[in-house]
């Protein structure tokens, strides 16, 4: 299996799917989006068509097109493009996995099906194995997010012996606040053979202390630069500085959570900070209110998080 020599590590932006005001995918801005992540945020890995990308609100055809555009625009700019291929049925997941391999993606990830749910570890692994087999040469990651799937199988239980059953398994995106479960995953990963990517942005420093090898999150789209500074401080064993960065990031996330924070609000914040129009979410999600956007902007300013191109004196400039 021709897996990349460099493991997936560091920050991975869970990308937004840009849309027009009438709900169609806005493909022309994806190239600009890639450049913004790399040049302004220092983020060179992406996770496409996940929760933040509204992957499960897109048609299979749209998911294929979105994946193709990110791979095309990211060529020679991004380090790794991981495509989420999870779906509610096996055949669609297999189709998307095979397509990801055909277009040159660097890896695939799969969420647990959440209508008809796996009742135990063996059933879930059987599903994951069949998806992975559709693209055996691609690194395979399990996307663990029990708060949305309702699948309560612990990640540390799943990891036990998984590579014997799924040879392409390379790690997991752990989007849960259960640090005991995550710590046990790290404890199993003695030889660091797996990428253990933490997915709760406001708890990242805690996960780094436990041994996270990287992170996948929505805030790295617009707070990647600040989070990278936290990673650098942590690597240099400057815990005081790392804590300072984490607390500032937490202040913002805590504030917007209290206002009501999700995919819709992430789109509004990314539009505000980057100047790239992300558009509204797709129904049933509702567009973020102007009040939310104004409050989020004020908080970003108070934390000095708005010093990015595309903004001038706090006001968004038109983007070409």
UniProtKB/Swiss-Prot annotation:
It holds the Pfam family DHDPS. The keyword Electron transport does not apply. InterPro entries: Aldolase_TIM, DapA-like. Aceneuramate binds at residues 51-52, 175, 199, 201-202, 218. The keyword Cytoplasm applies. It is an enzyme of class 4 (lyase). One of its GO terms (biological process) is N-acetylneuraminate catabolic process. Its main location: cytoplasm. Pathway: Amino-sugar metabolism; N-acetylneuraminate degradation. It comes from the Eukaryota. It is found in: Cytoplasm. The active site is at residues 143, 173. GO terms for molecular function: identical protein binding; N-acetylneuraminate lyase activity. Keywords: Carbohydrate metabolism, Cytoplasm, Lyase, Schiff base. One of its GO terms (cellular component) is cytoplasm. Its EC number is 4.1.3.3. It catalyses: aceneuramate = aldehydo-N-acetyl-D-mannosamine + pyruvate. Belongs to the DapA family. NanA subfamily. Homotetramer. Catalyzes the cleavage of N-acetylneuraminic acid (sialic acid) to form pyruvate and N-acetylmannosamine via a Schiff base intermediate. It prevents sialic acids from being recycled and returning to the cell surface. Involved in the N-glycolylneuraminic acid (Neu5Gc) degradation pathway. This is N-acetylneuraminate lyase. The gene is Npl.
